[in-house]
């Protein structure tokens, strides 16, 4: 199972269907979680970074985009702890796991507060995401949603006329993908759905993916700075949120960090990441059931 498959099987299908800040203790915990055999790599220079070096680089950005494999709990733990360390401001945390327009107001338990904001703990299992949100609550940062409204996705898949809402149409036109980026997105969606994606699904799925990235970018730009938590596919520079931000807000300083699974990257593998990510944080691969084994598609709506 390739990394890109885990990006999309656990992301697009979910979208469519379903005060210890900066303390030495926090720093020590985060440092201990970094496996020296699976480092943080700066893609441009191919240098290995310490956590402290990465933090200093992220502090310079207007917008920091942190990726993930959705089912890897260590990615969520590392990102939560990283946000605790980025304590120079109270940047808003923008998340994929809530719809755009939703904001978490903590009252009572963390899970109850998230449910009130529309969080789906079946789509985003609490056993995996719970520690992340508990850490975000400690950080005292605002948490807002950015995902595409499901009614838009349903309209696209039902074949509705003019399904792109007026609020996103201008940015959709401004951020049109180049032919190579469009081809890369198409291929990744096909591979990411195990080669089982019916041809009739491809065009609407690509549109949903693009509008989701635009929705995320718009929510970020409502603030002077922010941190996005989303799947690695959404934070890609060639066809994800950074591409949208570059098209509609070219003067903003955007940095992305992919959290991925690998025992190591050679120079060729690093070169393949050059047009996608600024930094890659490697973690130990986890054991998982093959998501392709039971993946099936019904007939698209006509």
Segments and roles (model prediction):
Residues 46-87:
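Zymogen propeptides
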Residues 2-11:
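Bacterial N-terminal signal peptides that target proteins for export
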Residues 97, 104-223:
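A substrate-binding/cap region within the structured catalytic cores of diverse enzymes
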Residues 70-81, 94, 100-109:
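Membrane-embedded segments
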Residues 36-40, 59-67, 110-117:
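Acidic/histidine-rich, surface-exposed loop or edge segments in extracytoplasmic proteins
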Residues 13-61:
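N- or domain-start disorder-to-order transition segments that initiate the globular core
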Residues 92-98, 255-260:
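Short internal beta-strands
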Residues 215-224, 234-302:
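C-terminal regions of proteins
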